[in-house]
C-alpha cells in the first residue's frame, strides 16, 4: 500500500514540477519569441503556403471563430466519408468492415470535438487507415483547436485595447509543430521501450499459458497513444483503452501516460501568466485547480484502496484494495489516480473500468466532469474557468458596490449574459438528456428492447450509467460506465448532438467575451479596483463554481451514486 501511495505522490510531483517550465515555453511559442523549436519554421511556412494562409494577418474574434468552425466542418465530412468506406480502403489486414452511418456520425463528431467517446471497440471497429487518418489526425487537430482558442484569448487579455485577437491558423499550426508533436515523440519512444507495438502487421497467432491458440490485435499503437493522452483526447486504440497490456504494458508506461494527460492543461495555466505578465493570476487559478484535483485524488485513492464492504462482509481479504475492474500490474492506487486525472481533464482514457469503482469514486469522477473547470482539456479547460471568473467578477462587484472589471475591462450585461448561458448549458444538456433516457426506459420499454436493451445493471447503478454517459459527452470527456449498451440509434445520435452543443457553443461564447472585452477602453487600476489575483477572489470563484456547477447535480447524485453508496 505504501508503495502505491508513493507512486501516486511521485506522479503528481512530476506534473507540478514540469508544468511550470513547459508553460513558460508555450507562452514563448505563442508570442513568437525565440525557442529551441525554431527549426520547425520551414515546415510551418510550407504548411501555410500549401493552405494559402497568411499567418501574420490579424483576425477579429468573429473571423477567428469563422476559421475555427470551417476547419471543423471540413474534417467532419472527411471523417464521415472514410469511416463509412473503411472496409474498402488500404491498411486493413484484419478485414474490418465499415461503420454504420449512425455509428460513424457518433465517432466522427466525438473525435472532432476532442471527446473520443467510443461506441465501438478500436481493434475491430476501425482499420489501420482510419486509426491514422481519422482518429490520430483528429486528435492532433482538435487538441490544437482548443489550444489556439486559448491563445487567442490570452492575446486579447494581454493587450490594453484591440479589435484583433491573433491568427487562428498560426496558433493552430504552432500548437501542432512546437508543442504536441515533440511531446508525442518523447512519449512514443518511452512506450516503444516498454513493449507497446508499432507496425502494420495483422493479428498475431499466439499460444497462451493454458496452451490455447489466440489471435492478438496489434498495429501502429505507439504512434497513436501519445497524442491520445497529450491532447486530452482519450480514445483508445484497443477497446479496453489503457488497461490493455499492449497499450499500457508496464508501471513505467502507466506513469508516462498518466503524466501526459495533465501536463499540458497544467502548463497552459502558467502559459497564461507568462503571456499576459500576470503570474499572480496564474498562481491563483493554478492553486484552486490543484486543490480541487488533490481532493479528488485523496477521496478516490482512499475509496479504492480500502476495498468494497460487501466483500469484507463475505470474509474475503482485500489487502490490495478493491480490485474489481483493475489491472493487477497497476494496482488500485494507480487506477484511482488515473480516474481523477482523466476526469479533471477532457481526456477520458482509462486504465481500469470506471463502472467497477466504488460509488463515491464514481461520484467524484462525474463531479469533475460536471464542474468541468479543473484544468480541463488542452486550452478549453482554462476557458471554462474564465467563464466563471466573469460571473464571479460580476457578482463580487455587485456585492461590494464596485463596477465589475476584469484586467482593466468593464464586465457589462452583454458579457454576463453570454457567460451565464455557457454556465447553464452544461447542466441543462446533462440533466435533460438523462431525464429523456430514463423516460424512455420507464414509459417506452419496447423501444429500448428494440435496440437490444441499454442497461445491464438496474436500480441506482443503472441511473448512474445513463447519468455518466451524458455527463461524459457534455464535458467532452469520452469515458463511460461501460455496463451501458450504447451502440444504438438513440445513444449514437443523442450523444452526438450533446457533443456538438457542448463543444462549440462554449468556445464561441468564450472567444466572443474575450473579443468584446478586448475592444473596450482600458481602465487603469485604482484603489476601487476589484483585484482578481488574490486569495479572496480565488475563494469567491471557487464558491461560484461550486454553487452554479456542482449543486445543480446533487439531486441526481442523491438518486444514483450516493444512494448506491448507502446501499452497500
Locations of the language-model features?
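A conserved hydrophobic secondary-structure block that centers on an alpha-helix together
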Residues: 126-200, 252-282
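P-loop potassium selectivity filter motif centered on the GYG triad
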Residues: 90-134, 197-259, 312-380, 448-501, ...
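C-terminal catalytic subdomain
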Residues: 387-391, 396, 400, 418-457, ...
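Selective recognition of specific alpha-helical transmembrane segments in multi-pass small-molecule
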Residues: 68-82, 174-197, 261-264, 273, ...
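Alpha-helical transmembrane segments
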Residues: 271-276, 398-412, 512-533
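Membrane-helix cytosolic exit motif
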Residues: 22, 303, 395, 437-440, ...
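Hydrophobic alpha-helical transmembrane segments
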Residues: 66-76, 138-148, 257-269, 381-395, ...
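N-terminal alpha-helical transmembrane segments of multi-pass membrane transport
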Residues: 1-106, 161-162, 166, 170-207, ...
Amino acid at each position: 500500500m505504501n508503495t502505491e501511495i508513493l507512486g501516486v505522490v511521485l506522479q503528481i510531483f512530476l506534473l507540478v514540477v514540469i508544468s511550470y517550465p513547459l508553460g513558460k515555453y508555450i507562452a514563448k511559442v505563442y508570442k513568437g519569441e525565440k525557442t529551441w523549436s525554431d527549426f520547425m519554421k520551414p515546415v510551418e511556412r510550407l504548411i501555410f503556403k500549401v493552405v494559402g494562409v497568411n499567418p501574420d494577418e490579424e483576425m477579429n474574434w468573429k473571423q477567428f471563430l469563422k476559421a475555427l468552425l470551417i476547419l471543423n466542418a471540413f474534417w467532419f465530412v472527411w471523417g464521415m466519408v472514410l469511416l463509412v468506406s473503411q472496409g474498402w480502403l488500404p491498411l486493413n489486414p484484419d478485414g474490418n468492415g465499415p461503420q454504420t452511418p449512425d455509428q460513424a456520425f457518433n465517432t466522427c463528431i466525438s473525435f472532432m470535438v476532442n471527446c473520443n467517446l467510443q461506441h465501438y471497440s478500436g481493434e475491430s471497429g476501425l482499420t489501420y487507415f482510419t486509426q491514422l487518418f481519422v482518429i490520430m489526425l483528429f486528435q492532433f487537430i482538435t487538441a490544437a483547436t482548443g489550444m489556439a482558442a486559448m491563445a487567442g484569448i490570452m492575446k486579447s487579455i494581454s493587450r490594453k485595447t484591440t479589435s484583433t485577437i491573433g491568427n487562428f491558423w498560426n496558433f493552430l499550426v504552432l500548437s501542432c509543430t512546437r508543442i504536441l508533436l515533440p511531446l508525442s515523440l518523447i512519449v512514443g519512444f518511452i512506450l516503444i521501450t516498454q513493449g507497446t507495438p508499432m507496425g502494420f502487421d495483422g493479428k498475431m497467432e499466439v499460444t497462451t499459458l493454458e496452451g490455447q491458440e489466440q489471435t492478438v490485435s496489434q498495429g501502429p499503437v505507439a504512434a497513436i497513444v501519445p497524442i491520445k493522452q497529450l491532447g486530452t483526447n482519450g480514445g483508445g486504440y484497443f477497446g479496453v483503452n489503457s488497461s490493455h497490456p499492449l497499450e499500457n504494458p508496464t508501471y513505467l508506461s502507466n506513469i508516462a501516460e498518466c503524466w501526459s494527460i495533465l501536463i499540458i492543461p497544467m502548463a497552459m495555466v502558467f502559459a497564461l501568466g507568462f503571456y499576459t505578465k500576470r503570474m499572480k493570476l496564474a498562481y491563483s487559478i493554478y492553486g484552486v485547480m490543484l486543490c480541487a484535483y488533490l481532493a479528488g485524488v485523496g477521496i478516490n485513492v482512499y475509496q479504492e484502496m480500502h476495498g468494497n464492504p460487501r466483500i469484507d462482509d463475505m470474509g474475503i481479504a482485500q489487502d490490495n484494495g478493491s480490485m474489481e475492474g483493475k489491472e493487477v500490474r497497476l494496482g488500485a492506487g494507480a487506477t484511482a489516480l488515473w480516474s481523477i486525472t482523466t476526469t479533471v481533464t477532457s481526456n477520458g482514457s482509462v486504465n481500469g473500468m470506471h463502472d467497477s469503482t466504488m460509488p463515491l469514486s464514481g461520484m467524484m469522477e462525474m463531479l469533475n466532469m460536471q464542474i468541468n473547470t479543473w484544468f480541463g482539456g488542452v486550452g478549453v479547460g482554462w476557458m471554462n474557468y474564465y467563464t466563471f471568473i466573469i460571473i464571479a467578477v460580476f457578482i463580487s462587484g455587485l456585492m461590494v458596490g464596485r463596477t465589475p472589471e476584469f484586467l482593466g475591462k468593464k464586465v457589462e450585461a452583454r458579457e454576463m449574459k453570454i457567460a451565464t448561458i455557457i454556465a447553464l448549458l452544461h447542466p441543462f444538456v446533462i440533466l435533460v438528456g438523462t431525464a429523456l433516457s430514463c423516460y424512455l426506459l420507464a414509459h417506452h420499454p419496447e423501444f429500448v428492447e428494440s435496440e437490444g436493451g441499454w442497461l445491464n445493471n438496474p436500480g441506482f447503478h443503472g441511473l448512474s450509467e445513463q447519468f455518466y454517459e451524458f455527463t461524459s459527452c457534455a464535458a467532452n470527456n469520452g469515458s463511460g460506465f461501460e455496463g451501458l449498451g450504447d451502440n444504438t440509434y438513440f445513444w449514437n445520435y443523442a450523444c452526438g448532438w450533446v457533443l456538438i452543443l457542448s463543444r462549440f457553443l462554449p468556445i464561441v461564447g468564450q472567444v466572443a467575451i474575450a473579443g468584446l472585452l478586448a475592444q473596450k477602453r482600458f481602465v487603469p487600476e485604482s484603489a476601487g479596483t476589484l483585484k482578481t489575483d488574490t486569495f479572496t477572489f480565488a475563494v469567491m470563484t471557487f464558491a461560484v463554481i461550486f454553487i452554479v456547477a456542482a449543486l445543480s447535480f446533487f439531486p441526481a447524485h442523491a438518486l444514483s451514486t450516493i444512494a448506491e453508496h448507502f446501499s452497500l
